[in-house]
């Protein structure tokens, strides 16, 4: 297990690697909440979550960029800029081409990575992904509300709202965000989270018009009860990509990795197909 930092223009990206089997290497990207705190210090949690993937392949978990200047967060946290930083990081690690397993905001970053650096990507696993955030959508409205609360430092209210919106519409709350709401923590690097949310609302981050260029096999998973990224948004991504398969869970909300029935089994089978 190794944790290293990689310099990129205006900041750095931390990576955590688990070495193992000889299949196509896997790169893992989380959602926008990844920006709450640096990757360092979470290694044991990451190892427990991803050690199952290492039976067949090396796994590298990538953090969001850490800007040298916090005031530069919105620029460096733009999904396309992050994708360029990830490309530089993978080349520095000597890893690639790779499979990508990404969730939510990490999915849009992965789409840009595949469009701009196609030589680095062999397969995509995208959970709760959207390629755009229409300004008049409920998704955009909720993100703007998150930004307002975060900038005001109202973290208790913020996490309580997240606990409700991350759950499936039929659940009481999302466990992880519910616990955070009760603890009312202040994230270590809120500027990264806020910066990525603002960039995600910027039309320059929308990648819908480029989806037809992505020819690699893609497994796209969505919860039909997702209150953050509606199923229609994820369906749009699957429809525009020529080699994408959409699989849905009727009872799952936004937390696809932890709540989608059979998630790991589906992903492992899809990744194994690329090892042949």
What are these regions (language model features)?
Residues 227-233:
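Conserved alpha/beta-hydrolase "acid-adjacent" motif
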Residues 243-276:
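Catalytic active-site module of serine/aspartate enzymes centered on a nucleophile-bearing elbow/loop
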Residues 81-98:
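Conserved acidic catalytic loop of the alpha/beta-hydrolase fold
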Residues 7-71:
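Conserved HGGG/HGGXW glycine-rich cap/lid loop of the alpha/beta-hydrolase fold
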Residues 102-106, 110:
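Gly/Ala-rich beta-loop-alpha elbow adjacent to hydrolase catalytic centers
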Residues 111, 115, 123-151:
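Flexible "cap/lid" loop of the alpha/beta hydrolase fold
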Residues 214, 220-222, 226:
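Short beta-strand/loop motif that positions the catalytic acidic residue
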Residues 135-138, 155-204, 210:
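Conserved alpha/beta-hydrolase catalytic His-Asp/Glu region
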